[in-house]
Design a protein with these regions (language model features):
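HhH-family (HhH-GPD) DNA N-glycosylase catalytic core used in base-excision repair
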Residues: 1-440
Length: 440
């Protein structure tokens, strides 16, 4: 078992409006079902454990492309949307934000009893991962969201998020069971986060001596521990002013590299984890996206010959704007991990609730949903042609990207989206009444 990724995200307030929350639940369910249909439940958990894919997944559903709320809204949408399909798809989601996270143990026990798992072992895993991210990594983030995703075969992934009020950031931690072998030796598969300077990482592979020393100290008499600490402070020239723990910690951080103390910047160099750091600005900028990849999507949607071929693949007449969205959704379903290095690009499927990069085009969103749901329903009845065409759409877009030079004109694309927004029932939170539903 290993933490698969980490992401740092700017803290944003507010809630997801009802009109978007309902659509996110439906689209999230449809995307999940497509992945499970084509690749299996294990593949869905692998994707969920990648912080870059997770960010693209949220962006393609119309959530803010970079804020802390993407974690809460995506997991809330999945929990609501998959609840009635859990046994059919073999995917169960437990926990949530705040008080809902405290329901995780009981929810796990109920599922374990139904599926024949060791419920207490799952509960132990849930608690250990939360403790590692809350306590064993001194990065200043307090966990407030904990979601445990379990498959019918017993594989699991965990997505949890902490906040740091002082920095105004949230940090998302990803875990995945096939990668984790030791809870106290580099267990994460990924972390999404911004550099917070020097931290103490007690689950680093090099931290075994520090872990052993801490266990030894815990068994010593308190008086002996304090005397040795005072002696150490005298030798290092640190004056005891009453804040003994703080001074000792800072001294250790500066000198004890062998004890697993390291800068967050070296995390990416020393481990195989995926690390995502989102910028502080709210608007989408050209440097946030791969313009050639976006250009390929737009070429397929708007160039007549390419558009006609894409329609042949999908066996349906579609407008260019809907085809643009479906091409990006298809990439989320079928794309390789390297395709998600620019998650902001996926906000060009359905915009963002805060108008970044443009308002959510509800008509396009619903057309995308209807196509995907219709393709899935047909596949359940044995007709897989549309779903197969949806897979080939991703390959076609990548072929266009490789064989042509389709770099997008960023300003022109934004201007076009803003111009057509009224005709597509473009909507944002600024158009809504003050009261909006909570995420869970």
């Amino acid at each position: 078992m290993k933490r698969s990724g980490i992401a740092d995200l700017p803290l944003h307030g507010g809630r997801v409006p009802h009109w978007l929350a309902e659509r996110m639940a439906r689209l999230g369910t449809a995307i999940t079902e497509t992945i499970v249909h084509d690749y299996g439940a294990s593949a869905f958990l692998s994707r969920l454990s990648d912080p870059f894919w997770f960010q693209a997944f949220g962006a393609v559903m119309g959530m803010d492309w970079h804020s802390s709320g993407i974690t809460t809204s995506v997991m809330g949408a999945l929990k609501r949307g998959l609840a009635s399909r859990a046994d059919e798809l073999g995917i169960y989601i437990c926990g949530g934000r705040g008080r809902f996270s405290r329901n995780t143990p009981q929810e796990l026990r109920v599922i374990a009893e139904r599926r024949g798992f060791d419920g207490e072992d799952l509960v132990r895993t849930s608690r250990l991962t939360a403790r590692v991210d809350n306590n064993a990594i001194g990065d200043g983030f307090q966990i407030y969201l904990h979601c445990f995703v379990l498959t019918a075969k017993g594989e699991w992934a965990i997505v949890q998020q902490g906040l740091n009020d002082q920095s105004g950031l949230a940090r998302r931690y990803h875990w995945h069971s096939p990668s984790v072998r030791d809870f106290v030796a580099e267990p994460h598969t990924g972390i999404v986060g911004e550099n917070q300077g020097t931290i103490m990482n007690l689950v680093d592979a090099g931290a075994r001596p520090a872990q052993t020393a801490m266990l030894d100290i815990a068994h010593e008499h308190p008086d002996k521990t304090l005397n040795e600490a005072r002696h150490l402070l005298t030798l290092t020239g640190v004056q005891s002013t009453g804040s003994l723990r703080e001074n000792t910690f800072r001294r250790s951080v500066k000198t004890d590299n062998e004890a697993g103390v390291q800068s967050t910047g070296s995390l990416r160099e020393n481990t195989s984890r995926r690390r995502l750091e989102m910028p502080g600005h709210h608007d989408v900028r050209p440097e946030n996206i791969n313009l050639k990849r976006l250009g390929a999507v737009l070429a397929v949607a708007y160039e007549r010959d390419l558009h006609d071929f894409a329609e042949l693949l999908l066996l349906e007449n579609l407008g260019p704007r809907t085809l643009q969205s479906l091409a990006l959704i298809s990439e989320v379903v079928h794309g390789a991990p390297s395709r998600f290095s620019d998650p902001a690009r996926f906000s060009f499927a359905h915009g963002g609730k805060d108008r970044h990069p443009f308002p959510v085009p509800l008509k396009t969103y619903d057309e995308s949903l209807n196509f995907l749901r219709g393709s899935l329903d047909a596949a359940r009845l044995g007709d897989k042609d549309k779903l197969d065409g949806f897979r080939r759409l991703d390959r076609f877009v990548r072929a266009v990207e490789t064989r042509f030079d389709p770099e997008a004109d960023f300003k022109a694309v934004i201007a076009h989206e803003e111009a057509i927004s009224p005709s597509l029932d473009g909507r944002s939170v600024f158009d809504d009444k003050p009261h909006q539903p909570s995420l869970f």
